[in-house]
Amino acid sequence: GLITNPTGVDNQMKSTIDILHEAPNVNLVALFGPEHGVRGDVHAGDHVTDIKDATTGLPVYSLYGKTRKATPEMLKDIDVLVYDIQDIGCRSFTYISTMGLAMEAAAENGKEFIVLDRPNPVGGLKIEGNLVEDDCISFVSQFKIPYLYGLTCGELALMLNGEKMMAAQCNLHVVKMKGWKRKMDYVQTGLQWVPSSPHIPHPHSAIFYPVSGILGELGYMSIGVGYTIPFQMFAAQWVEAEKLAGNLNALNVPG
């Protein structure tokens, strides 16, 4: 079984779905879709439905619909559950919640879990923000980790499993990257960026998202979502632009 979306590609931009489906020694029997779906064609926050994949004919089970966690029925025909999604290193991005709940499901149903690791686009040195409080645990803050957690998805999986931060621990294996250094941002990896969601079109979007995403969720100002610069601005009719700019400049924030 494969949990993935359009970001699951090799360095020739071939989908992991196609790679595993065509591999002679692999029997890919099911796909699992996170938020936005396996093919990335579902709007943010909209429920993803169970479908048949048009390209491979495989069943696609939703992990962002009636259930957020794979059921025994979904997992009955698989031996190994593989996770291959490019994340952005921010706690409120839902893919890591999907990964964690899938790891729990794998543990509870006796399935091996494999993470195909990918770079953290903001690097592995930036760790910022408070831990989520107990009464605020949700699908957009599933684990008690900093808002910017400074780990790759494989490293995070190892921590969640090793520190027993989930209800059950799985038989976990991480396929590590070659050549990645913690100081690298995504551009420095030389890899082609595939949008991790419709509103994360560029690798630098991962830098803007943690800053403005929460403001957008509060619903009282625009952060550029729906325009060509998602998360790169904040604006509202009641903002006095020159006064705000003066107050911000007076802080003398470096950069």
What are these regions, as identified by a protein language model?
Residues 48-78, 90:
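Glycine-rich oxoanion-binding loops at beta->alpha junctions
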Residues 27-36, 116:
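Short internal beta-strands
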Residues 24-26, 106-112:
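A short helix->loop->beta-strand "cap" motif at the edges of active sites that frequently abuts
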Residues 1-26:
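N-terminal phosphate-binding or glycine-rich loops at protein starts, especially the Walker A/P-loop
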Residues 180-255:
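Glycine-rich, aromatic-lined ligand/substrate-binding cores of catalytic
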Residues 136-210:
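Conserved anion/nucleotide-ligand pocket segment
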Residues 40-44, 114-136:
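Glycine-rich, charge-decorated loop segments at or immediately adjacent to ligand/cofactor-binding or catalytic sites
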Residues 87-99:
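Glycine/threonine-rich flexible loop motifs
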